[in-house]
Structure formats: C-alpha cells, structure tokens
Regions:
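Charged DNA-binding/catalytic regions of mobile-element recombinases
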Residues: 1-291
Length: 291
C-alpha cells in the first residue's frame, strides 16, 4: 500500500524522500514496479480516480461519507473506511468549517412576538414537505459592501424554497423570499413559519402576509440561535462551501455565485446527511414516490 502512495505522488516528490518518510527501501519500491499489480491495487487505482472526481465536483468540500455515497450512486459500492483511506493517502480532505456570521437580527423592537411552536423539533423529515418553513437572514461581505441574503427552508426536505438578496435588511427583503417560496410551493393553510425575533419578521407587514395565506408564525426564544438551528446550519454550509473561497469585488458577482450555489448545487445535487445522503430535490422525489 505504501508503494502505491509513492507511485501516485512520484511526479510531485522525490522517490527517496517518500521512501524515507514511509519507512520503505528505495530498492524494494523499484522492485515492486516490475511485479504485476495486485487486484486490490488495481481496484484502488480505479476508485481513486472516482474519489478525486467526486471530491473536486463538490468544490473540495466533501469528506469520506459523502464521497462514498457518490461512488455508490455511480455503481461503485465501496466502504466509507476505504474511501477515507484513499483520500488520506492522496492528501484529500474536506476543508474545516469556520463561522463568519455577521449579526443581522434586530430584536430590540416593540412588535408582537409569536410563540415558539417549533421548540427545536427539527426532525420532521420523512413525513411531508410544506408543513414547516424556517426563515433567516445573513450578511455576505463583498468589496463593494455587505449583501444581505434572506432564505426560506422547508424543514421536511431541507430545500431552500425561497430566497432574496438586497443591499440592506428591510421588510421587502424578507417578504420577497417568502413570496418566492409561496409561489413555488403553494402550501396548504396551517403551515408553521419559524424565524428569529428580528424586526422584519415581527413587522406588521410580514405578519399580515403570513395571515393572508394561512401560515402560522413561530419565533425563537430571545438570544437562542439553536432555536433556529436548521437555518443557521444552512448558512454555515454556505459559508463553508462557497463564501470563504471568494472575495467578490461587487455585490452583483456575489449574487450570481449564490444563485448558482442554491439552484445548481445545494437543492439538486448536494448530499445532506440528515436526508440519508441524498440531495433535497432527490429526497422530495422519494417522498412523492412513497406517498
């Protein structure tokens, strides 16, 4: 196995150096090149090619569990342990998460606060969609200034069903994301809409929009980000997989990148651990087929 590692990296590093690091003799390594490759090594080489492709396609964000799911979906059944070994040998790893949230919640207002109907009961997937939506707003830095992103996620499938971006936080930003979700999904009356206590979500105009379409407001407890953990998790994933890699000169460039991330990666393709490592779109197809 150590010989295979040397062969994979011989164009990058000196063979003698790698032999010393891996505690094998150069003579033994060169002798191994004249022997027929074992079946195990041949399969490893094939799998490694697919591991590299899956890892690169994710923007180098997938770790072994998600890469393993990609290979299995491609008809290459392999254990997570083997994928982890191959990734380790090739120097591939999911880049660690690092939070960079800018505070966007203004909870110092006199507007009414809705009760917390969700109470951290986030595990509603597997039953249906359009029963609980969670909303939040985050700030995205660009060299031109902050860009604000409002999102609406379906708790049943973790799909981002509505989103909007503006240069500032206001009622129109939050309403635009909500209206996009409503027009795309047409939920039945009784849907629970959960958010933090921010002034835009507590505003009369937002409450009126919810009431007009039969949605029931729910809000987190004061100062408790875990009460809206699903929305926070989405923003952490966005930060990890997209935002930290870029220094956008303008808001327009950031808008285009975030649009692509949500609509061409996160919703249709990104494997979600909560959903059994399928994408939100695929999970909804499974729910519909099982109904």
């Amino acid at each position: 196995m150590r010989y295979a590692v040397i062969t994979r990296h011989r164009r990058e590093f000196e063979v003698r150096l790698m032999c010393r690091v891996l505690a094998v003799s150069p003579a033994g390594y060169y002798a191994s090149l004249t022997r027929p490759a074992s079946w195990h090594a041949v399969v490893d080489d094939l799998l490694m090619r697919h591991v590299r492709i899956a890892h690169a396609a994710s923007g180098e964000t997938y770790g072994a569990p998600r890469v393993q799911q990609e290979l299995t979906a491609a008809g290459l059944p392999v254990s997570t342990k083997r994928v982890a070994r191959l990734m380790r040998e090739d120097g591939l790893a999911a880049r660690g998460k690092k939070a960079r949230r800018v505070a966007t919640t203004d909870s110092h207002h006199a507007e009414p606060i809705a009760p917390n109907l969700l109470a951290r009961q986030f595990d509603v997937h597997g039953s249906a969609v359009n029963r609980v939506w969670v909303s939040d707003i985050t700030a995205i830095p660009t060299r031109e200034g902050l860009l604000y992103l409002a999102t609406v996620l379906d708790l049943g499938s973790r799909r981002c069903v509505g989103w909007a971006m503006r240069d500032r936080i206001d009622l129109d930003l939050a309403l635009s994301a909500l209206r996009m979700a409503r027009q795309a999904r047409h939920p039945a009356p009784g849907l629970i809409h959960h958010s933090d206590r921010g002034s835009v979500y507590a505003a009369l105009g937002y409450r009126a929009e919810l009431a007009a379409h039969g949605m029931v407001a729910s809000m987190s407890r004061k100062g408790d980000c875990y009460d809206n953990a699903v929305a926070e998790s989405f923003f952490a994933t966005l930060e990890f997989e997209l935002l930290r890699k870029h220094d956008w000169p303008t808001r327009a460039e950031a808008r285009r990148a975030i649009f692509r991330y949500i609509e061409t990666w996160y919703n249709p393709r990104r494997r979600h651990s909560t959903l059994g490592y399928v994408s939100p779109a695929e999970y909804e197809v499974q729910l519909e087929a099982a109904a």
